[in-house]
Amino acid sequence: MAENLSDQDCFEKLSSSKEGQHWFCSGLLTQYIQPTFFWFAHDETPSFKWVLNAYHERLRSCTSCIQAYYELRNESLAKGSYSFTGFSITDLQEKWNKWDIIRVLEDFKALEDETIDFTSLPCLIFETLLNPKLFTCKNIYKNAIDAFNGLLSDWCSNIFLPGYLLFFYEASHPDVLEWVHSFFKENTEIRISSATVDAVFNTVVFESQNSSDSDCNFVSISSPEFWERTYMFLELLPLQSITAACESILKDYLLNLVKTSESLSSQQMSCLRICCNSSSFWSAADSFKEVSSFLKNLLKNVTATPFEVSDMNWAYIIASFFRTCLNDFVSVFPEWLKGFVEEKRTIGFIIYSVLDALFDLLSLDYSSPSFLNNTLSLMNANSITILQDYPEYMLKLRLHSLLYDIAFISWSHKAITKNPSFVFDPSYELSPFWKLDNLQEEKISDVLFSKISSCCFAHDIEISENSTPSGTMVQFAELWQVMSEYISGFLKGFSEKSSTEISNMLGDSSKFDTVVSFLLSPTQPLYVSAFHIVQIITNCTKNRNEALKKLVAMDFRGIVHGLADAVLNWQSILSFFPALRIMRFLSITNKSLSSDNSAFTENDIPTLGAYWQCIWNILDLVFSNVARWSLNNPADTVKALMKLTLKFVDDLFQNDGIFIKLLAKFDSLILLGETSESLFSFIMWLKINDLELRGIVINSLCKLFTKFSNFDYLFEDRTVTFLTDFIIRKQKAHLSADQCKQLANVLTQASPEAKTVLEQHRLSEMRKTKKQTELTNSAHVIKPSPTPQITVKQNTTKSSSAPRMGMLEQLKQEYLTKRNFESKLKSSAVSSRKPTFNEVKPANLLAEDLSDNEDDIDRKQGLFSLAKANKIPEIRQQERRQVQLLSNSTIKMHPSQIRMMTNRNVANVKARLFPSMTDFYKEILSWEPANQSPNPVLKFHKLDGKIIDSFKTVEHYMEVLQPMIFMECWSQIQSTKLDLKFSPVEGIMVERTAVNNFVDIGVSVAPKDLYGYPLYDTEVVSLAFNKEDASSMKGLCCFAKVERIVRQTNGVLVVLRTLPSMEILNKLQGNCALWFLKLTNLATFTRQYAGIRGLPYFHLADDIIRARPCSQPVKHSSSEIKAAMKRYQVNEPQAKAIMCALDNNGFTLIQGPPGTGKTKTIIGIISALLVDLSRYHITRPNQQSKSTESKQQILLCAPSNAAVDEVLLRLKRGFLLENGEKYIPRVVRIGNPETINVSVRDLSLEYQTEKQLLEVNQGAIDLGSLQELTRWRDTFYDCIQKIEELEKQIDVARDVAEDTKSLGKELQNKINEKNLAEQKVEELQSQSFTKNKEVDLLRKKAQKAILKQADVVCATLSGSGHDLVAHSSLNFSTVIIDEAAQAVELDTIIPLRYGAKKCILVGDPNQLPPTVLSKKAASLNYSQSLFVRIQKNFSNQMCLLSIQYRMHPDISHFPSKKFYDSRLEDGDNMAEKTQQVWHVNPKFTQYRLFDVRGKERTSNTMSTYNLEEVEYLVNMVDELLNKFPDVNFTGRIGVITPYRSQLHELRRAFKVKYGKSFMSTIDIQTVDGFQGQEKDIIFFSCVKSYSKHGIGFLRDFRRLNVALTRARSSLLIIGNMETLKTDDLWGSLVDDALSRKLVESPHIDSEGRLITISRTSEKRMKNEEFVEPPSKKLANSEPSKEIRQRS
């Protein structure tokens, strides 16, 4: 022990410990540290100095050690105060405090001098917040305050309450005060000790008294602000913490003011008023004489001016004093008042004001109402007349009096029920106000009607037949008789109002709850009065059941709310007679629900869920308490309740019942989990001795088990164990063979473990029977071998031949026999069986382990023989449980296992988010820049074949797809080399560092050379020793990756990572000139590589490699789909897609053909996930959900910025909730602000971060600089938008051979303006943010906070892999990807790295696929999306959005038939909605093909064009414009073609025909460039004509689908029909148009057939390499009739 250790022993042990060992928090050296706290009593020795230094080192680096140090020191010195005699303990404490101050001050100075690491700062702040005494040092005070102010969000912990309280009195940092105030406001359950308050007040008082010697800026205790600050934190504390504060020196300060001051300030009065709520503020030692002077001064204001009823603080302060001495209030206070108050009315008012306050304070203490009996003697008819002139106060007093009676009756009934020997004052009299006629006065009636329900379950106390009621019971019965008559009369008076008036009043839920409560009352007059009210509002006076059914139909939600409140009230007494009434009420309610459950809508589901919870709570109470009730109530009545309950349970699960349907609406396991307690209580009824009831119990139990098993319910271990034991001991349980078999059958189906145990027992019994047969001559019975889990002893006691006792007799005797057997039972209660199924012994339940002796008692005494009849079970008053999933695990893991699992999870997350990228950069940086071959040379990755439909292992998947990244990257670099947009930049090499296998080269560059030269740390550049080599990438040149960019005062340092050859490395000498040229950005490729390297740790890894969607799609009923259609305002296919996305895990595929509302569906899914998913967390009506589930965050992605921003625009508008309110989710857009749509730029992370910084840190940022920064940033964005417009204009001008010099000059001016703006933004950001480390840290924290608070985070697929997202510890369980069919597979897996368990892919595989530059990669299926790969494997598990709202039916006819198996339907009235005036002209109808047999030509770029088609198309447009001059066609006409050369010719022709200005009214694009757009009229030029190479580009069915689905009202196709018919796909298009007589051609014969005039024999061609979309591969489709006939 520490007492026996010498100083030398302690020193040697401490000095021999390992370096860096944690001495305090580990607890290993406690006994050696404790004696050192007394060493300050002696002169300082070298040993002690060494120990102090060691302490200092450990307290500098570990917050846990700091906390343990103070606890250990205080504990040691406190113990030493009794035994240590060498020194004053107070002096010792003071010496340690001084050492702490010196130590902490040294560390702050060392931090400032940078002699210790910055990481010590948190420990210093931690200690100062923990120990307020440190604030007495002015330098510590200043440093700690400043540091805390800069890092506010890091210190949200109750550990620092001493420091937080101290900050309430800090005067120089209002922002700290505001933060601490917010912390207390948000954390409403803060617990503060009196010691904490003492420490804070001592510090503040010390500083106040020594203000001249201190720079610490605490408010003075003598100033009004001190009490204002005290009130500020007191009003935020719960009562428990106020009580603790009243046990501190704060109470002494206040009492001193009360006893010495003539008056108190308003701030002091406010503090005193709050403290008076605590019963510990005044003590019995505080005499009336001591405070009388204060009370007299307090009452001066009351007597001097007309009193106001509203301001009653003075009354509460006086009442708080008399709370501890009620006798003085009765005997002393009135006489004392007469000494200085003359008016009798004023005396009466003061007395009744204080009496009124006493009611409130005593109820706050949860005191017995009988404590006020003496004060009630003041309330008599004579004294009441004093207040007749003050009706408002008289009304309040009257209500208090009435409510007091209600509280007294309710409290007395509970007290006597729990303790029959309880005695209360028999002199109690009910209020005289009950006899007045004005109880129906609105102000009284409203309050009284809401409160009387608390005594609805009061009734005569239940006693056994042979017992004699006590005097208390008789007195209560008499009192209740009178009270019930009063209440009944009040209810009858209420029922005399008009039915309309009653209905309006019952619209208040509290009043409706009262009616429901009295419908459950066991007191007949009250029940009758309440029922009369029901008859009036339902207009049903004859049939009681019909009236109740109508009530349920009228307000089911109110019924459930009232029932729940009534049951909570009943739980506090759990008497028998209310149970009968409750069960009858439930039976009627259920019949009403089951008779017409079609009336219930989706909105009623939460209420039904709450009702379900309420039902099983009631059943649990009935099952658990029947044993106790049977002791004091007639047997027939108890049996009637049991039969009623059993029938009710059976009826719950009728096949057509409401709850069978309810289980399908929710996760059935969640709802059935509510039944676990009830089910275990129910199986105790198996021990009943009544044969009839036992049979009913077994049948009911078997039905329940069967129903639950159908829903895969996991029964609790204790339930299964009890039933298994019970079946094995069937003889002692009095079970017949059939009953055993019946129970065993359902049990084995429900539990495999039980099946194993019962089978082993059966085999054991067989061996036992055989053994006994062999030993017939033996004098004893050999015990059978034990079963593996349950040991069964052979009972040698012969059963009694006496007839079995009746149930009632047994239940009566149980009370007596239980005492006789109690000691015996205790000794035999230790079961010989082993625990089974992870069994945890239930606490305080009716059943215990079944020993032999207990079984004998069971057999003799029957039902509930194990209940402790002499002890009423404690009333369960727990808050109603929320619905939770049933936990399968009941075993606690060993701490080492927990640590291992935690470490493994952390490692997995790290591997998933931050895989090694070394091989990626090795591969790219090893490439030769001069190499111009189409494919790279791969040194570190091996090409391993095509992407197949399904992979078996992650490793194989990675081996195949990783090389695709490098082939695409190589192609990107080669493409950039052909069209260089930048020139090389010159710099000087200033540093060279070896990093692993790489060489990092620091190049110093002049800032002006980087203006307008966007360079990021993900760029790859060519690096050479001269400008020519860097540009041509020949000679001594290598690739380099930009590692980081450091802006310095004398230039910019660009650090380049390289893998140079020896020749280059040898030439890289100090200060040599280097040139680098920006080539391409590697961001997407690095994120793809990081994604695939982390794939083994993805939740969806197996689904990705096997390309499979959710394994078992959930089926939805028609009613659910209709409800979803109404909820989200969508059509049926969209509703199905939303529900599938909501219910399925894994991948969900939604195919959205053109115009079918993909975006609207996505918004519906987000709405369902963010808002409506809460319907699975059932709470009582009008009760706030307390779900502790983590925040649901959604990651929304798409391949392009435009697609992301399109959905974002819709999200920005918000969506409607079920109650009609608008909900706007918190949305954050991640990405380069340059690429984000202007309309949603305010949702960008950058914008929101700066906005938040401005709001929370105004003092740290110069407002002028910030405004200038905003102005330059706006200029930057405006320039980007203008540059995009100018580039489009130049593109068009070039096509029409127009001079672009002026446009080019304007473009260059805008580029220069943009570069200047970018330079200014960087400079201002550097000045405002990066120079201020604290603000820069706040910026990063703000970004993380914004991301964590977001409901939806939006980004491109590549952008979702941004490092900021990875480092923000975000977990997106749901990912939604729009346009998923346009993304390569490796892009799709990037957003899945954040723990995704649900991924919703939305797209259309029948439209254009992703663009892949590498022909080699494309040939290996790299251009195939993950969407398509999954579709190939599971085509029947796609949700098809099958209703289009874009095209006229004539236009949609062929795409629907050919590409969507005729399943693409038209929306309502689409023909009328798309009808246009030009349709009257037969040439410009909704859909038509024009046969133009021109000549195909090839341009220099090997692109095809057809001038005849150009001419024909221009003339058509001209004719359209001339024939309909009144129609404004601006922006309504689109011209598309598959070939870029044809695009140029078309633009040139229109320019010649109409001039330059016309080009802004018509949109001419390639088919690929027009995807995602739509126009009223589309002219489609096919180009191909008599080609030797077929129709080429046109053959891709996806391109054709895009082309045919862009038009809303008219689609006009111009092409050579003869050539087009040579292709199988296009031929079907021409044949379809011919059959519909929609082809205009001079080459059609009289029978409507196309005449062939080709000079070459052409046969219809079918592309062998590209397969047309088969009908079988459509979403959720079956083979068409045509296909089935062919097969």
Swiss-Prot record:
ATP binds at residues 1134, 1155-1159, 1407, 1445, 1574. This is Helicase sen1. Residues 781-801, 1661-1687 are annotated as: Disordered. It comes from Schizosaccharomyces pombe (strain 972 / ATCC 24843). Belongs to the DNA2/NAM7 helicase family. The keyword tRNA processing applies. Keywords: ATP-binding, Helicase, Hydrolase, mRNA processing, Nucleotide-binding, Nucleus, rRNA processing, tRNA processing. The lineage of its organism: Eukaryota, Fungi, Dikarya, Ascomycota, Taphrinomycotina. Its EC number is 3.6.4.-. Monomer. One of its GO terms (biological process) is termination of RNA polymerase II transcription. Coiled coil: none annotated. One of its GO terms (cellular component) is nuclear body. Residues 788-801 have a biased composition (Polar residues).
